């Protein structure tokens, strides 16, 4: 740290100092000269041969030359050989001043009179800070006389001219003495202590150890032995400044004897170009360096100029030795010059430099490497992610460096490895991607930041992304994947994860037949998939979603569970609230326990075809089945035998019910009603609504418990009857109030009563013609026998599912038939007209209508009511006698309301206009009836009012 601090201080003072009257270096020439800043390799290679017995002498020569003194001459001939540098040179920059002062101090130490000239020229303007003895940066051993180097000038040629020195490869004779002399602490200080480290050569030549020690020795041991005089005289200097100064001084033509032979110093760029050219002299850089570390023939043939000619190289040595020379710092300067230059120059043989990073093949020249990279596509981004091809490849790429001969024969190596690289690698790389599963080889060492992107480390991730989801094949680029998709059509079925799992499991068992493969999928995944991919209609499992979809589309199995669950959602609402289970499971537990799949399908078809959720009009078995189902959903789970008994009891108790008053007046009406679907529904609901909770909460003397019941909320009353806890958040009524048809009737009866009443009743009230009045009277007086006969006729007709013509044609025919009946039946008693009309008035139009109407009988009595009531003239009279008769009809009103309610709930096929007309008719007479006033917006009250109007019409 002290050493660095001293160097920084020297540099700071050098910058602040004034300019000496020294010659300014020709910066352009020095900058353009090719011998700039020899590298560490060149220095180390040349120093090995030049460390002879005159080592101390050559260091003194270096010191003398760095100060401008010729080593062969004494102090007396200093100024005669060449003028003093400080006096003759113009002013220098502060860095040059610092260096010159340092050189002058070194000259003073060894008795050269240059210090006086420097002092005379520069004066005491630049005070030199004196370092303490422990940190003296420079150590010039004074063991030898200054004239010692003139005898060994050839051995002291440290020029970096590699080509010139290559011819004379004989080391000096007195290397052993110099090794002993310069070994240890007497080595000069390495000024490049803070710069990047150099890798040692594997087998250094003789004398090479000394040079390495000189450049790599630690500074504290060298400084500790420094003499006080040396430490006081030699300050620390920035090695960069010293190198620049020395190079500028000694290469800028300051010495007339130096004839500016630029080839003495090898420029790194020149070295690079020589390596690239691949010449024999340039390719043997390191080998010739190590084998021929001796003086150049130029120095040997010109002994008179030897004191001057080694100056650039001895200047380099003195820079390393005395701390201000160019070579020790010159290596540093060139290392800073370009990282790649030092990297290539430290590589050794060119074959180790030109190496393919992918196939690890070496090449003698850059041209061979470039050709190899072009042929084998081993360049950068497009490189395969796995450099090592599989072992079954006959000639793997990473074995290419082995076949060529040893690297001494560069031409043979060039041809052999070049040919091997030009043919086999390119052939092998074409098949590289057939082995995508091989583990990746380690990528080359990281040279620059972000090289992973270039060198293909991201290719592996890209291949994981660019993977066909069907066959799992990876691709290098999106284009290849697109081509694969187009060729294989693997994009047609975009598969989910489950589907891909099922496909893989199916492919694994593709050899066995379909059933065996399905049964053999024993993994947990396959079992789960089989459970999921099961047809809900036929309970058949499939391997893939595609098979299940094809099966459902082919067999139409997707419609059945949907419709069945849709019907189940409407009917077993209280049961679902009790259990809070899926509809299908509840159907299987309760309703489907005693029935087969055919029963469900029959029930489905009946639900589809009939508006009353019931089966056909003449089918007694379906009527009983439907009554059983409805009873079972409301009252709870019962055994099939119990359900049958309850259905029979309902059918028998219908004539005993106090609310079916019309059965007392017509004996045959009982038989007709017993066979109808509506009778079962009415009986079921009358019994359920006559439960003790209703009688306990309502007065028994009430004319109609069903109507007054509706003053309380529908949900709470029905839930109480069913015994369901109201604290549970199942506040839906028995009839699903969310049903669209139910909402329709509810809102039209309560909210649209005024407008609908005026719209529907106005045309009927405008012209109460005698014919209409006569019809009203006829309905009041008609007997029950014709009605019963007509009902039987209608129920014996075959069931038709069509609805369209019924609403289009039947109203007009209904008016005609009602008029005919009014004319025929005229003087009958009116005491039981209410109950008769409930049965007869609905059936009258359909029985007496045209043959087309007979082919399309209503699905239930309430259906005929719906079709007739909006258009029937008899309905216009409900406003006249509705107020007086409204209190008498409550028992049958509730039955009519419930039957029409179920009729409306099931009539998905009845058009919106028919429902609107029905609701309008219900609202027309709703305002006059007391039920509407008491019930308000209650849904059941609205439905009851609708049936009350039918009875009022009579």
From Swiss-Prot:
Residues 292-303, 862-885, 893-907 have a biased composition (Polar residues). The modification Phosphoserine is found at residues 750, 758. PROSITE patterns: ZINC_FINGER_C2H2_1, ZINC_FINGER_C2H2_2. Residues 579-588, 778-807 have a biased composition (Basic and acidic residues). One of its GO terms (molecular function) is DNA-binding transcription repressor activity, RNA polymerase II-specific. A zinc finger (C2H2-type) spans 354-378, 466-490, 533-557. It is found in: Nucleus; Cytoplasm. Residues 47-57, 318-328 have a biased composition (Gly residues). This is Protein teashirt.
């Amino acid at each position: 740290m002290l050493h660095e601090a001293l160097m920084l201080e020297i540099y700071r003072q050098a910058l602040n100092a004034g300019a000496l009257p020294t010659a300014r270096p020709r910066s352009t020439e020095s900058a353009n000269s090719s011998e700039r800043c020899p590298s560490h390799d060149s220095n180390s290679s040349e120093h090995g041969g030049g460390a002879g017995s005159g080592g101390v002498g050559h260091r003194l020569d270096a010191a003398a030359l760095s100060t401008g003194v010729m080593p062969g001459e004494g102090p007396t001939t200093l100024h005669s050989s060449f003028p003093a540098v400080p006096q003759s040179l113009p002013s220098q920059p502060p860095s040059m001043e610092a260096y010159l002062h340092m050189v002058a101090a070194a000259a003073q130490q060894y008795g050269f009179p240059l210090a006086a000239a420097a002092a005379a020229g520069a004066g005491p303007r630049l005070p030199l800070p004196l370092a303490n003895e422990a940190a003296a940066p420079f150590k010039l051993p004074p063991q030898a006389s200054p004239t010692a180097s003139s005898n060994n000038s050839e051995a002291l040629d440290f020029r970096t001219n590699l080509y010139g020195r290559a011819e004379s490869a004989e080391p000096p004779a007195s290397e052993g003495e110099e090794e002993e002399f310069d070994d240890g602490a007497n080595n000069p200080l390495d000024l490049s202590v803070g710069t990047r480290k150099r890798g040692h050569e594997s087998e250094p030549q003789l004398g090479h150890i000394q040079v390495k020690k000189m450049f790599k020795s630690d500074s504290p041991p060298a400084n500790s032995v420094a003499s006080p005089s040396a430490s006081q005289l030699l300050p620390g200097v920035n090695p960069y400044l010293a190198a620049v100064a020395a190079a500028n001084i000694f290469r800028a033509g300051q010495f007339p004897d130096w004839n500016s032979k630029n080839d003495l110093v090898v420029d790194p760029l020149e070295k690079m170009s020589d390596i690239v050219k691949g010449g024999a002299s340039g390719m043997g850089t390191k080998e010739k360096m190590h084998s021929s570390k001796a003086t150049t023939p130029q120095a040997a043939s010109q002994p008179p100029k030897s004191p001057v000619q080694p100056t650039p190289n001895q200047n380099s040595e003195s820079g390393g030795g005395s701390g201000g020379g160019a070579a020790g710092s010159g290596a540093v300067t060139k290392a800073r010059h370009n990282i790649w230059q030092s990297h290539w120059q430290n590589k050794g043989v060119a074959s180790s430099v030109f190496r393919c990073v992918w196939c690890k093949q070496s090449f003698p020249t850059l041209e061979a490497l470039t050709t190899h990279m072009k042929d084998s596509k081993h360049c950068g981004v497009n490189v395969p992610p796995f450099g090592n091809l599989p072992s079954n490849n006959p000639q793997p790429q990473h074995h290419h460096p082995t076949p060529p001969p040893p690297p001494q024969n560069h031409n043979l190596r060039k041809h052999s490895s070049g040919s091997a690289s030009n043919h086999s690698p390119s052939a092998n790389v074409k098949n590289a991607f057939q082995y995508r599963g091989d583990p990746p080889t380690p990528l080359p060492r990281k040279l620059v930041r972000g090289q992973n992107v270039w060198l293909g480390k991201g290719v592996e991730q890209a291949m994981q992304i660019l993977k066909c989801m069907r066959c799992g094949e990876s691709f290098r680029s999106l284009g290849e994947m697109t081509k694969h998709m187009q060729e294989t059509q693997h994009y047609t079925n975009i598969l989910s994860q489950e589907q891909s799992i099922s496909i893989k499991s199916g492919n694994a068992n593709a050899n066995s037949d379909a059933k065996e493969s399905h049964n053999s999928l024993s993994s947990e995944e396959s079992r789960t998939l089989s459970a999921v991919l099961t047809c809900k209609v036929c309970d058949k499992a499939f391997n893939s979603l595609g098979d299940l979809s094809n099966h459902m589309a082919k067999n139409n199995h997707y419609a059945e569970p949907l419709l069945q669950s849709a019907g189940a959602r409407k009917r077993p609402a209280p049961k679902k609230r009790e259990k809070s289970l899926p509809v299908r499971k509840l159907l299987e537990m309760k309703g489907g326990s005693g029935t087969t799949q055919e029963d469900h399908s029959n029930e489905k078809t009946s639900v589809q075809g009939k508006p009353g959720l019931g089966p056909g009009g003449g089918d007694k078995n379906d009527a009983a089945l439907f009554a059983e189902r409805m009873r079972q959903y409301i009252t709870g789970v019962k055994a099939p035998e119990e359900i049958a008994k309850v259905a029979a009891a309902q059918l028998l108790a219908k004539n005993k019910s106090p609310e079916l008053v019309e059965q007392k007046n017509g004996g045959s009406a009982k038989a007709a009603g017993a066979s109808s679907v509506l009778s079962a529904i009415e009986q079921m609901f009358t019994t359920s609504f006559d439960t003790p909770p209703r009688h306990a909460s309502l007065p028994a003397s009430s004319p109609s418990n069903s109507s007054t019941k509706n003053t309380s909320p529908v949900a709470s009353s029905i839930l109480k009857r069913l015994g369901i806890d109201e604290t549970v958040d199942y506040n839906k009524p028995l009839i699903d109030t969310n049903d669209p048809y139910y909402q329709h009737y509810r809102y039209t009866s309560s909210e649209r009563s005024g407008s609908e009443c005026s719209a529907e009743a106005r045309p009927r009230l405008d012209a109460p013609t005698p014919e209409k009045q006569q019809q009203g009277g006829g309905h009041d007086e008609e007997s029950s026998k014709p009605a019963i006969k007509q009902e039987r006729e209608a129920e014996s007709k075959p069931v038709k599912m069509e609805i369209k013509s019924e609403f289009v044609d039947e109203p007009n025919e209904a008016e005609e038939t009602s008029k005919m009946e009014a004319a025929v039946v005229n003087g009958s008693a009116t005491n039981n007209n209410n109950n008769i009309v409930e049965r007869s008035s609905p059936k009258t139009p359909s029985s007496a209508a045209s043959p087309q109407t007979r082919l399309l009988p209503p699905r239930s009595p309430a259906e005929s009511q719906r079709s007739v009531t909006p258009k029937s003239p008899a309905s216009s009279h409900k406003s006249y006698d509705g107020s007086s008769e409204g209190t008498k009809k409550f028992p049958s009103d509730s039955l009519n309301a419930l039957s029409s309610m179920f009729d409306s709930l099931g009539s998905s096929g009845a058009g919106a206009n028919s429902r609107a007309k029905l609701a309008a008719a219900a609202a027309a007479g709703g305002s006059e009836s007391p039920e509407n006033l008491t019930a308000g917006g209650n849904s059941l009250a609205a439905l009851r009012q609708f049936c009350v109007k039918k009875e009022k019409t009579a």
